[in-house]
Each structure stands twice: as structure tokens, then as C-alpha cells.
């Protein structure tokens, strides 16, 4: 993540966590997005609760994936925002005080680890140990640039259009991006043939 725009996941632990990260990145909403932007833990103990309406696109898809509770914790060292740690479970319920304290310690340790790994990287480059997860999103950045040119809009607007297309067509964002890069999907301005 950088600035005010989530940049994607660097690490997931299983297929469900990978799906949750793809949903957040693709939809632009979810616990990690909010934890990063708000710089505060975001705790949702029951995604299926009628009181849980903060993520109208993310929540139903996360529930379909078997996730019932999600918890996002910012990764920040001093004033440096690094990203967010996402925890989930398949049963609803809040974190206990001990679990919450452990998650805060874990987020701090992950943040320190990222800084240590990044310390030896050349300026402007990502540490080799962190590159694996970043590779998954290069295609999306390339597709955003292509759509930006196709529509004559900013890259940020192009990413919004890609996300909207993926959501409307019930396709993973990465699949849509791969189609754009492969030139099997082209975005056209209103009134253009494409």
C-alpha cells in the first residue's frame, strides 16, 4: 500500500486469505483498506450481522468464501505507513482482549520485519524478499495504464473502471487485467465501437 491507495497484498497464508486480499484490492474496500487509511484497528466480529454494513460489496463475497469475522490492523512504524495485517475466522465473534493484544504485537513485528527487509534495498526498489506478492499486481498496473490510454482518463480512474467491470461481471480483478493486457478485452469511451 502507498499513499492513500491500497497497492495489493505482499503475502497470504492460504487460499481463503488470498481470496480475501483479492476482494479487498479489487473492490477497494474491506478491513485492511480501512485499517490502512484510518491508521486504526478495524474489527468486524460478524460480517453477516445486519449492523455490519460498512463494506456492501466485500462482505457478501467474503461470507460466500466462508469468512464470518475480519480484523484489520495497520502496519505503521512511527509516521511511516507500511500496510495492514488482515486476520479472519470462519466463526463470528469478537477478539478476546488477549487476542487483540496479540494481534497488535504481531502487526508491530510484521511492520518491523518489513522495514528490516527493505533497509538493504536500493532506493525506489522493493526488497527481493517482498517481491513475490508484488508480482501478482504488475499485470493490474499495466492494465490500468492501458485502460487509461484507451479511455483518456487518469490511471486512478482506469483502476476504478477495471474494478467496476470486474464487479459487474463477477470476475476476479486480476483476470480482467490479464484480459486487457492480452488484448482480448478493450475499454472504449462512450459512443465508441470496441
Model-derived features with residue positions:
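Short beta-strand-to-loop transition segments that serve as allosteric relay/switch motifs
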Residues: 47, 84-93
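Allosteric cytosolic regulatory segments
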Residues: 100-111
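Short hydrophobic/aromatic beta-strand element in the GNAT-like acyltransferase core
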Residues: 55, 59, 72, 84
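Short hydrophobic alpha-helical segments used for membrane anchoring or interfacial signaling
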Residues: 1-5
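Short hydrophobic beta-strand micro-motif common in sensory/regulatory domains
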Residues: 69-76
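Regulatory sensory and allosteric helical modules in signal-transduction proteins
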Residues: 9-10, 17-54, 60-68
Amino acid at each position: 500500500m502507498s499513499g492513500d491507495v491500497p497497492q495489493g497484498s505482499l503475502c497470504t497464508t492460504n487460499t481463503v486469505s488470498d481470496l480475501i486480499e483479492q476482494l479487498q484490492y479489487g473492490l477497494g474496500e474491506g478491513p485492511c483498506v480501512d485499517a490502512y487509511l484510518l491508521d486504526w484497528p478495524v474489527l468486524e466480529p460478524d460480517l453477516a450481522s445486519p449492523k455490519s454494513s460498512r463494506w456492501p460489496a466485500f462482505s457478501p463475497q467474503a461470507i460466500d468464501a466462508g469468512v464470518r469475522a475480519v480484523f484489520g490492523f495497520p502496519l505503521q512504524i512511527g509516521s511511516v505507513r507500511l500496510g495492514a495485517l488482515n486476520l479472519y475466522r470462519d466463526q463470528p465473534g469478537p477478539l478476546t482482549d488477549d487476542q487483540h493484544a496479540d494481534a497488535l504485537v504481531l502487526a508491530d513485528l510484521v511492520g518491523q520485519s518489513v522495514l528490516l527487509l527493505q533497509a538493504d534495498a536500493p532506493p525506489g526498489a522493493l526488497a527481493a524478499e517482498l517481491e513475490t506478492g508484488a508480482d501478482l499486481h504488475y499485470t493490474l498496473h499495466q492494465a490500468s495504464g492501458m485502460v487509461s490510454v484507451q479511455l483518456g482518463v487518469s490511471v486512478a480512474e482506469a483502476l476504478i473502471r477495471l474494478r467496476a467491470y470486474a464487479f459487474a461481471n463477477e470476475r476476479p480483478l486480476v483476470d480482467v487485467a490479464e484480459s486487457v493486457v492480452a488484448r482480448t478485452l478493450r475499454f472504449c469511451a462512450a459512443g465508441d465501437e470496441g
